UniProtKB/Swiss-Prot annotation:
Family listed: Belongs to the AIM9 family.
Gene name tied to this protein: AIM9
Transit peptide, residues from-to: 1-40
Identification of the protein by name: Altered inheritance of mitochondria protein 9, mitochondrial
Main subcellular location: mitochondrion
Cysteines joined through disulfide linkages: none
Cell compartment(s), UniProt: Mitochondrion
Gene3D superfamilies referenced in this protein's UniProt entry, alphabetically: Phosphorylase Kinase, domain 1
Taxonomic source organism: Debaryomyces hansenii (strain ATCC 36239 / CBS 767 / BCRC 21394 / JCM 1990 / NBRC 0083 / IGC 2968)
Keyword annotations from UniProtKB, A to Z: Mitochondrion, Transit peptide
This protein's GO CC annotations: mitochondrion
InterPro entries xref list: Aminoglycoside_PTrfase (IPR002575), Kinase-like_dom_sf (IPR011009), Mito_inheritance_9 (IPR051035)
Amino acid sequence: MLKLTSRVGPKRLSSGLKSSSFKVNATIISKKFQSSLNSKPNEVYTKLSDSEDPKRHQFFQYTWGSWMKNDQSEKSKRETKFSIEGITKLLQDLNVESKNQRNIDKSGEPFVKAPSQLKDGSYVLTQNLTSNLIGKEDSLLVKSIASIHEGKHNRIYKVTLSTGKELVLRIPYKLESEYSISQKIKSEVATMDFLNLKLGANVPKVVAYGANKVNSLQSPFILMEHIEGDLLMKQWDPLVADETEGSQEKLKSVIEPIAAFQEKLLSITFNKFGSLYFNDDVSVTDQSSLPYNGEENPLLTKRWRIGPSVEKSFSKNKNQLSEKEIKQYSRSIDADKPLETITSIAGIELENLRNRLALAQADSGNKVENVELIQKMIATFENLKTMSTKLFNPNSQSLMNAEELFKPRLYCPDLDPLNVILNSNKNNEPYFVDFEYTSIKPFILSSYPSFVGYQGAKIYNLEEDIPGYSEMDEVEKQQYQFMYYKTRNERLWELELNSRKHDLIAVASPHVKVLKSPYVQALDFKNDKDYLYIEGSIVQLQAMWEAYVANELCNATETEFPIAFTAEYLDEHQKDIEDYQMEIVSTPFAATSGWVPQDMFDSLKEQGIIVETENGDFKVETENVLKESE
């Protein structure tokens, strides 16, 4: 019998909602929320021969939260069904590969070679089939499988082997097209392989992977080393007061290891923009170009190549686009054309919006669309496309080390203490575990890690920057303290960057941040009305454009702003953005796109605060919230 473990209960809140996740009655709701669910994992035993065992159903279902709208549809996309018999078969095949003389050297240890395809269609990195990862026994069996985490894009299972070793099985949700998921897996595995073999970075070693459903598991997957230990996030206290003893050391204990890892990422400059893949996973054209210069290890010279970018914009909400349409914009870009990385983002969004508009006008889409809103979004991304080649001057003399800032470098968008495990088996060394959507782009276009990034008003000294601060009441002081702490944390990150990569510190310039804001906002385009933030960041440039042209910061010689905004349009835009912000503030759980942690959802529903509507959606019953607050 095989043991399956699926955890439900309060621990699901450990990743948590930020206090700003929903604005209306947030305090009231949170006070009334008390979980009554059992935190003990549910254990189920199943026969390997019974693939239709109903006990397995819960093991694959999404249980981390619920949605206020389209709940069943959203959960269905996150069902991670895979063949349990298939993973047993895969491990048996891996055991055979680990003993195959073609994969081991004279000392009996596996050596580095290109990924090998198994008969079932999956791939294995034979150099990682070591006794440290899978054990030494002649047979390799699955003892148990436990669901240990339901993330934003993947579900994580822990596979315990008969040898006592543990592996992580990662199954992606069906949130993107099959092509996009396939590209992401191929690139992420190659990126982790590069970080391990070339840079010697602390990342899990990948044992096997499948980029599509054609494998024993009947699902895309990555099977990798399990890292035991606590998350670095447990040490992160972003609002610790300066007066607290050891506060600076506490903050730096989290910032420094992540900054050190970024330093490794930045240590190599590449020959193209795009993403990393294994040689056989890119086109013949991309195979002809070396990813970087100076490689002397013969085992690595033909191992990796740069292919299409897997940055999130090329896959998020792009399910209706064909592989050909996506490739047109995600293709690799020559190193001497850095601004094309901005143009490509505008291009893919325009392609997607025009496709949506065509379906809406033909009344053949699968949802009701607001045609006027789509047309406004198209106009904004047309503006971004116009600005894309003008935002920066790659040869600017006013920008310190401009040449270095525009070189292709590795960028991981998920550098975060939530993705860092302190390996308890290796003296708590930090290991980095999430490389989805990693791309090669100009460093000047990269964003700070989200745990330290701050786009709000900066406060460097509460007493000096805020008139009358000392006379304010505590509630008002706390608002400014929050802004100060966010400013401080970002500043600590910039100081680390300056000490490690001084030649790249110009990214900290306020003018650089303003100039790249339209691009950054476009990368964060999640909901339709977010186009207003993109447009707003373009409008913001207008006031400073003449100065940017005069100082050769932007790639333009004409002082006239490239886009003509009428006064009427600017007034309308200001009203639209104010209305959108009010909509967000007045809609519970808007900041999480209607997602509610399951413990909270069940508790609020039991109290009558969340109620089901006639169409199967849910809403917050305001009257019941007010009653509970009395």
